[in-house]
Amino acid sequence: MGYYDDDAHGHVEADAAPRATTGTGTGSASQTVTIPCHHIRLGDILILQGRPCQVIRISTSAATGQHRYLGVDLFTKQLHEESSFVSNPAPSVVVQTMLGPVFKQYRVLDMQDGSIVAMTETGDVKQNLPVIDQSSLWNRLQKAFESGRGSVRVLVVSDHGREMAVDMKVVHGSRL
């Protein structure tokens, strides 16, 4: 992984190749995926300093070309900042990546008091699943759920046993 020193000079460690990580939060592995930096936009969710964060600023070093991301932790609302991973898979080829979370998809069963009741991919029921308080997601969920047109699904990010719905979609009849 790279870093910036106090004089704003970028440094890259030799073993900065992108890698999948596993955590020990709930006994199941919390996995990450590598995302090429040219695909990352403001508002995307990345893993910064080991925490799921929503990107609020992207900068690029003029000297090294390395990307730097500032994000807000989805669960604690703290700021985290990290530089992109740089790897050289072949001579004169430079690839910059960041780690992103693996999202889960749950089916919404009920909505109550600012949280949802949802069914996981394995059929377990999750009570009181919080919804991210941005991008009017709660209003969009309510509208889709009350319309009754298709099955409402939420994309969920988890961190050390805690989960939060961060986006939604409606799956219509033939794809249930």
UniProtKB/Swiss-Prot annotation:
Residues 1-31 are annotated as: Disordered. It comes from the Eukaryota. Residues 1-16 form a propeptide. It holds the Pfam family IF5A-like_N. It is found in: Cell septum. Disruption phenotype: Impairs plugging of septal pores and leads to the loss of cytoplasm in hyphae severed by lightly drawing a scalpel blade. GO terms for molecular function: ribosome binding; RNA binding; translation elongation factor activity. One of its GO terms (cellular component) is Woronin body. InterPro entries: Hex1_S1, IF5A-like, IF5A-like_N, NA-bd_OB-fold, Rib_uL2_dom2, Transl_elong_IF5A_C, Translation_prot_SH3-like_sf. Changing Q127A: Abolishes the ability to self-assemble. Major component of Woronin bodies, fungal-specific organelles that occlude septal pores in order to separate intact from damaged compartments. Hex-1 binds directly or indirectly to the Woronin body tether that in turn is anchored at the rim of the septal pore. Forms oligomers. Self-assembles into hexagonal rods. Belongs to the eIF-5A family. Hex1 subfamily. This is Woronin body major protein. It comes from Neurospora crassa (strain ATCC 24698 / 74-OR23-1A / CBS 708.71 / DSM 1257 / FGSC 987). The lineage of its organism: Eukaryota, Fungi, Dikarya, Ascomycota, Pezizomycotina. The gene is hex-1.
